[in-house]
């Protein structure tokens, strides 16, 4: 359904790519939200410390984004997620989980500390309860996977946690990976589209990815791995559900650039955070990134808009 790959040790740049796979399009919108933006979500209210560029899902919340400090966050589906009880004091919803982290934190270390006592509750999106876990990485190369299990947040925090997929929970994915070459087992590379197969395949190709000569090769390398775990339209899972890849993103945490490919368009677009004014008092801006006419740097094409969430 979704896969995230973080290439942190290539010697050129800290780069990440993720796929978005679902039954229907999540209608992504590209947002640039300045620091100092005020948000209210249930009992929680805050003012952002950092500017954020990234994607929303169904105008309900942030699914994939990077902030001006070089911290990125990605929500991926996790069917076995167990959130805190509804009405928990000071809770935020899963739909604003990634946004809350990016608004408050500059590093993975800060995020892990801030999330320690934060209750996260489930809120429906278009009538669906969507279990999810949160992948984080920063410009230092640090990484964390945060999963709501039995009402508590379980944190896996280490730079080597570079690959995330969906179910089962992350610790079980790591155990499954050990059955395959070159991770301690003797099984050959799997070719299916199930979450466990995608996890192994992404880890395998990342293990063998050659050092890039420059930034272009670094971005191309991590995106090529995302391509190996993308799902074409029509291909069924074991449960006969069809969850194609709707888009792929990439984040250059070293140079603060956010890339986007819609799988209904042949073109790549990107936003340079250094070229957009994210200071307090500047307007929130947005762009529909699925327009087939878009190509290249679209930083200047974002226009003022009202936040729907």
Which residues does each predicted region cover?
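A contiguous strand-loop segment
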Residues: 1-90, 296-301, 308-309
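Short, surface-exposed beta-strand-loop junctions and turns on beta-sheet-rich folds
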Residues: 22-24, 79-81, 151-153, 264-268
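Catalytic cofactor-binding cores of redox enzymes
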Residues: 117-153
């Amino acid at each position: 359904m979704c896969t995230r790959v973080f290439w942190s040790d290539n010697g050129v740049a800290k780069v990440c790519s993720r796929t978005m796979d679902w039954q229907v399009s999540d209608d992504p919108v590209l947002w640039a939200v300045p620091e100092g933006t005020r948000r209210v979500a249930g009992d929680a209210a805050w003012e952002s410390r950092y500017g954020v560029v990234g994607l929303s899902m169904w105008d309900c919340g942030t699914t994939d984004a990077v902030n001006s400090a070089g911290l990125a966050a990605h929500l991926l589906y996790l069917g076995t997620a167990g959130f805190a009880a509804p009405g928990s004091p000071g809770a935020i919803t899963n739909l604003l989980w990634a946004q809350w982290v990016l608004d408050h934190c500059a590093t993975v270390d800060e995020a892990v500390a801030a999330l320690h006592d934060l209750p996260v509750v489930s809120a429906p999106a278009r009538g669906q309860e969507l279990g999810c876990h949160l992948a984080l990485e920063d410009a230092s190369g640090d990484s964390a996977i945060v999963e709501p299990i039995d009402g508590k947040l379980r944190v896996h925090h280490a730079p080597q946690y570079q690959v995330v997929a969906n179910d089962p929970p992350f610790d079980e994915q790591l155990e499954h990976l050990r059955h395959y070459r070159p991770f301690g087992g003797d099984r050959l590379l799997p070719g299916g589209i199930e979450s466990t197969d995608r996890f192994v395949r992404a880890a395998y190709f990342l293990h063998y990815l050659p050092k890039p000569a420059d930034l272009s090769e670094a971005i191309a390398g991590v995106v090529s791995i995302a391509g190996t775990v993308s799902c074409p339209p029509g291909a069924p899972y074991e449960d006969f559900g069809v969850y194609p890849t709707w888009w792929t993103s990439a984040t250059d945490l070293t140079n603060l650039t956010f890339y986007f490919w819609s799988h209904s368009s042949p073109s790549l677009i990107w936003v340079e955070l250094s070229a957009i004014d994210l200071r307090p008092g500047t307007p929130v801006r947005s762009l529909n990134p699925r327009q087939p006419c878009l190509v290249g740097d679209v930083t200047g094409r974002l226009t003022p808009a009202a936040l729907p969430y």
